[in-house]
Amino acid sequence: MRVIPAIDLKDGQCVRLQKGDYGTAHKVAENPVETAQRFLDAGAELVHMVDLDAAKDGSHANYGVVEQVIRETGATAELGGGIRSMQDVETVLALGVSRVIIGSAAVRDPEFVAEAVKKYGDRIVVGIDAKSETVRTDGWLGDSGENYIAFAERMESIGVRHIIFTDIDKDGMLAGPNFDQLAALRASVSCEIIASGGVSTLADIAGLKKLGIDGAIAGKAVYTGTLDLAKAISEAK
């Protein structure tokens, strides 16, 4: 299992939200490039990046920052937020990003996901963000009404091999992941599952590993010092 540190970008800065609420955004680091470098120095093999501005309104103001992070640190990175078309996928890959995360568009336009997977294979990841077991869209502001497991099974059936599952109620709360939902998801699909939301202790990492989860995204816990990234990476191996 691997631990993947997160950089959430808003107005070019590293921020964190609580439960996906943009009103709670607060800066957690001054410099995204230096932040990514610290993550790499701690042993991270992949950096998870989210463009919060793009997720909310489709603007791409943070793309220059993403490109700079990859160019200056050599980081292997995945990026999500506001990716709604094949043109968006190609634009993001041109930044040097290794994997593209499709979120809301996967709910509305599964044919787009199928096309992206057919062309780019393992470079396509679907982000499933759930609240009370239903999939949310548009920066978590919209409710699709679809059960997260049914949606994951549908994505796997069209060729998706990587899923990031976020329990919105756990996000940014430092209260541990939703092990029950993750166990149910693990029992339902065979593709790679990366857990996001609430990962904050070495015990959380061990618990996810025991469930057979393939990766864990750590955000707020790393910034607050609650979770030592190097130790978490070691625990996951």
Label every PLM stretch briefly.
Residues 2-6, 46, 74-78, 98-101, ...:
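Structural preference for beta-strand elements that scaffold enzyme active sites
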Residues 3, 54-70, 84-90, 104-125, ...:
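Active-site-adjacent beta->alpha loops and helix N-cap segments on the catalytic face
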Residues 7, 51, 104-105, 128-130, ...:
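Short secondary-structure boundary segments
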Residues 8, 39, 47, 92, ...:
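Conserved, mostly hydrophobic/aromatic
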Residues 11-23, 90, 97-171:
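Conserved anion-binding
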Residues 13-60:
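N-terminal beta-alpha supersecondary unit
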Residues 28-40, 85-90, 144-154:
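Short, acidic/polar
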Residues 73, 77-98, 180-215:
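Catalytic cores of alpha/beta
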